[in-house]
Structures are given as C-alpha cells and as structure tokens.
Amino acid sequence: MTNITTKTDDGICIVKINRPEKLNAMNIDVAKEIISTFKQLEKDDNVKVIILTGEGEKAFSAGADIEYMSKISPEESERYAKLGQELTATVENITKPTIAAVNGFALGGGCELAMSCDIRLASDNAKIGQPEVTIGIPPGWGGTQRLMRIVGIAKAKELVFTEIGRASCRESR
C-alpha cells in the first residue's frame, strides 16, 4: 500500500493518505487502500483508536482526483461513486473510535471522509467544504446526510445552499 501509511503506538493508529503532491486526492486505488486498512485495523486488538489524516500541511484530502476522474468512463465513474460510499460507510461503521485530524483542505470527498469519522479536529489552516455544489453536483458519498447529523438541518442547508465552500472551521460551526 503506497497511498496509505500507518503507524501504531500505544494503541493509537495514525492512518495517513500519502499523496501530498496531489493534495491527498483520492482515486480508486486510494479508496480501496483506505477500506482495506480500516478493515484490517478493525481486527487488530492492539489498535484502540484510529486517527485519519493527510500527509503534509496543505491537505487532509482535496477529494476526488480530478485528473483521474477526467480520464475514466461513465461506468468507471459510477463504480468509483459506489466505492466512495463503501469507503465512508466503512469508516463510519468501524467499532473503534475514529478521529479526522484535518490539516489544510478537506474538500468534496475529503470533507465527506472527515465527516465519516466520529470526531473531527481541525488545524487553524483547515478549509472544509463541498465545492461541487456550486456547479450543481450533490455530494455523492452520503455527505449531505452526515452533515445534517453533525450540524443540524438548518445549518446543513445554509452550508449546502450558500456553499460557504472552503469554509474555515470557525465558519462551519
């Protein structure tokens, strides 16, 4: 697994998306590796807590790898969307506590991935949002439902309809 790194110490496993040159954007391989990693960690009795983050200071994850997305067929795009739903469901449903350590951008699928964790902690430079709504594309990995559960219906509508976009952490509270 080259796109994901893990380090476990004293029951805490840090899982890093390791594509800093792409702002930790996710393609099908990254999504599969995260799913596989979380399934392995679920079975590991030495792991008590999982922290998910992105390599580097610029991004937790910029979401879908747009370069990758521009080159795939509609059928592959549909498979990728379903895999994204599996990814967020896997993270959300793991029995161990999960923490998203959001550094830099958490956009689109990256935002949805962070919302799948039990707790989200953000650095001062974090920018969180779902900019796809500005071009009429709804979040495809269950993000709208998770957002409502996290911030409430009224705030979720405000965030999605007005698209605070790459909101600072203070703005998205």
Sequence positions of predicted segments:
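Conserved CoA-thioester-binding segment of acyl-CoA-metabolizing enzymes
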Residues: M1-T53, E75, A89
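Hydrophobic/aromatic residues within transmembrane alpha-helices
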Residues: V15, L52, D65, L113-A114, ...
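A short, glycine- and basic residue-enriched loop/turn
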Residues: P20-L23, E57-K58, G63, F105, ...
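Phosphate-coordinating loops and pocket residues in cytosolic domains that bind phosphorylated ligands
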Residues: A25-I28, A62, K71, F161, ...
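Short, conserved glycine- and acidic-residue-centered signature motifs
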Residues: N27-V30, Y80, L107, G140
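Hydrophobic alpha-helical membrane-association signature
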Residues: V30-I34, Y80-L83, L113
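Glycine- (often His-adjacent) and acidic-residue-rich active-site loop
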Residues: G54-A89, A106, G136
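Crotonase-fold acyl-CoA enzyme core
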Residues: T90-R170
